[in-house]
Amino acid sequence: MSKKHPIISVTGSSGAGTSTVKHTFDQIFRREGVKAVSIEGDAFHRFNRADMKAELDRRYAAGDATFSHFSYEANELKELERVFREYGETGQGRTRTYVHDDAEAARTGVAPGNFTDWRDFDSDSHLLFYEGLHGAVVNSEVNIAGLADLKIGVVPVINLEWIQKIHRDRATRGYTTEAVTDVILRRMHAYVHCIVPQFSQTDINFQRVPVVDTSNPFIARWIPTADESVVVIRFRNPRGIDFPYLTSMIHGSWMSRANSIVVPGNKLDLAMQLILTPLIDRVVRESKVA
């Protein structure tokens, strides 16, 4: 953690909705005049697409059917930790881009399934913003959570997460439901052991909960809408959080525990703006006087 060069980390698994949260952060940064440098978590995957397939085949032949991008070993976590530490100490660092599709390939000049070259951060940023799978990892080799000043978890209930992933991968990547189901099953071990423990490290968790039947996510025709959901927002340390103000400003919200507030799904963006804007202002203000 660094007062002078703060780091904000948003963590969630594939299909959790971290990209939507990133959009809200971008709005806050733009409105508040905050210059952020960004890391997309897949920039720190260890393998490109072809090498990942070869590694999957090798491990499957050896009897390991649990290896996935969720796994610690599939990612350059020591390098990510090093970049977090370097940024916290100096405001400098580097990242790259993983190219997913032809549209990104046209912009970057790199074939889909490969990485761009490493590039340095701009030197005049106010903070570092990370969005990905491993922004709050603590294990025997790395402590990434300890280097982030504000850690956000995005954690839909698991059936909703699966529905979102199935629909996204079918729509944008051309996968069949069966293929996505196989990926979900293969990732389950790492999901339990690598992804879920991070949400005990986060400062705030946003958990979307549908209020319609999602009991069989593999046949769901539609993703539950915001109007068909509520969002549970849990604060690790509720001291200083003005819950009466939040419940008065967010129509239909209520406190479910001393450290949790529930908001209608269509009020999530407003809730994030109200909760996160003062936190971002504080870390930026403290960085300027550090």
Curated annotation (Swiss-Prot):
Signal peptide: none annotated. Activated by NADH and inhibited by phosphoenolpyruvate. It catalyses: D-ribulose 5-phosphate + ATP = D-ribulose 1,5-bisphosphate + ADP + H(+). Pathway: Carbohydrate biosynthesis; Calvin cycle. ATP binds at G12, S13, S14, G15, A16, G17, T18, S19, T20. It is an enzyme of class 2 (transferase). Pfam families: PRK. Its EC number is 2.7.1.19. It comes from the Bacteria. One of its GO terms (molecular function) is phosphoribulokinase activity. The keyword Kinase applies. Is not found in cells cultured chemoheterotrophically and only low levels of activities are found in those grown photoheterotrophically on oxidized organic acids. Belongs to the phosphoribulokinase family. This is Phosphoribulokinase 1.
